[in-house]
Amino acid sequence: MSSKVSRDTLYEAVREVLHGNQRKRRKFLETVELQISLKNYDPQKDKRFSGTVRLKSTPRPKFSVCVLGDQQHCDERKAVDIPHMDIEALKKLNKNKKLVKKLAKKYDAFLASESLIKQIPRILGPGLNKAGKFPSLLTHNENMVAKVDEVKSTIKFQMKKVLCLAVAVGHVKMTDDELVYNIHLAVNFLVSLLKKNWQNVRALYIKSTMGKPQRLY
């Protein structure tokens, strides 16, 4: 466990979050979020960090991924039922900002074949990039299902203009152990991104969508 958050504290907070949810069942699957408050950081002067880490358990089961594929990838995905678009379908959007925005909204992330990825700015314009959803590369040596799972399990920390950030680390149907392991990975990775590591952390909380925040640090 990371030195500043004891195993006991983590398990206790996770139990509180999960039990709070059991008391009040919602009609949707609540996400569990890690909320971070930073200190001794100047977003104007200090380098704004950004980084991604893969968690052990998928934090958002409903996270949707669309493959922008060449012929081979489009044929492959038929067997595994993954949403896809080929180059012709992308060209039909005709760089229309509204349509590209709609596409960016429809899916949480995109994968693209090698032959397509370089053409995306030309075919679609900057829409996907602006939405922070520029596709990740999908090569022919990779298993498509495994790659989609990897994208679903990966979270991104990105420092913006404010000193707080939040990322999804799980959901309320997970076991204590799954959630603890994900939070542990996420916290350690985040701290490694910070200039002064733990000295930049003011507070850490976890909370479910509708639940009360539980302090870890």
Swiss-Prot record:
Residue(s) carrying N6-acetyllysine: K91, K106, K118
SUPFAM superfamilies: Ribosomal protein L1
Modified residues (Phosphotyrosine): Y11
Biological processes annotated in GO: cytoplasmic translation; translation at postsynapse; translation at presynapse
GO CC, one annotated term: presynapse
The keyword Ribonucleoprotein appears for this protein: yes
Annotated protein name in UniProt: Large ribosomal subunit protein uL1
Annotated source species: Mus musculus (Mouse)
